[in-house]
Amino acid sequence: MKLSTSTNLIAFRPDYVSYFPILDSMKRLKAVGFDAVDLNVSDAGQPFFRLGDDNWKEWMQEVAALSQELSLPITQSHAPFYNALEPESKKASLWEQMIPRAIEASGMAKVPWIVMHPGTYPDDAPDFRESKRRNYEYFMPYLELADRFGCGIAIENMADGFSTHRRPGGVYCSTHVELCDLVDSFHVSNVGICWDFGHANLMGIDQREALRVMGKRLKATHVADNSGKLDDHILPFQGNVNWRSILPVLSEIGYEGDLTFEIHNSTSRLPDHLVDATAALCEQVGRYLLDLANDKVHNETYGHTC
């Protein structure tokens, strides 16, 4: 199990107009000690992520070459996302051009797993049949494309409120039961689950039980904390996710992927001169999380008692 982070840990600046270039971010993330990165292709609409350029393949070759040079593997990526089942979505035109590029780009960098969001069909009945059917039809061509480029797709758990058209009861695949059911319907080897611990915390899910149910379906993670109210994307132990209880289950189920931070809000509002020091702190917290995940932490003490 490697310690990884989304490239967005060193990306946006407080004005959300300025940014650090991806190649620079990768060098800095390696310098503070991360083992691997998640290429955040969901930033494809931003000027620092040049997937929309005419020469995007040349740029992606630079990214892949730097990954090799730094010995910083790109062990997962995150495709652009929107609710693909929402009729007449204004985002569809751009993102449906970018998603195939994201898959090909991931193949160029030998990325094993591409994370994608499922969609929710508007006004779906409580049996979720239409959402499931349409997600199957949506993902199947992308799974075939990913297979051609040597990649798999890890479908991510959602949380209520992620769609402007909500079905009764919330958003599809906001529970591990729905997600496992969808993944099992494909009957192909290059599909799995990305478990977002922060999303699950918003849903109040028993994450220990959820991980056990997912088992070998689990291929990737998004590690972030929150208070249970908003999807804050902050450093673990700054919210109320019970990491000490949850993470040891990863070794119990034989999880073979990485612990991957998605905590851009821990750095995005900081002045430039504090970003690297904060990223280094995140790396230290990540090492402790790895110890928890490998069930190496026992009989902790917490300072002095009165």
Task: List where the protein language model places each region.
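Active-site acidic/histidine proton-transfer and metal-coordination neighborhood
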Residues: 58-62, 68-73, 83-192, 202, ...
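Glycine-rich, proline-tolerant flexible connector loops at the mouths of alpha/beta enzymes
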Residues: 38-63
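Pocket-edge positions in alpha/beta enzyme catalytic cores
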Residues: 14-17, 51-55, 87, 91, ...
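A short acidic, helix-capping loop that chelates divalent metal ions and anchors anionic groups
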Residues: 12, 45-50, 83-88, 122-126, ...
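Conserved beta-strand positions in the central sheet of alpha/beta enzyme cores
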Residues: 38, 76, 115, 154, ...
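Conserved long hydrophobic alpha-helices within structured protein cores
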Residues: 1-7, 29-39, 145-159
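Histidine-acidic metal/acid-base catalytic patches
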Residues: 1-35, 68, 96, 165, ...
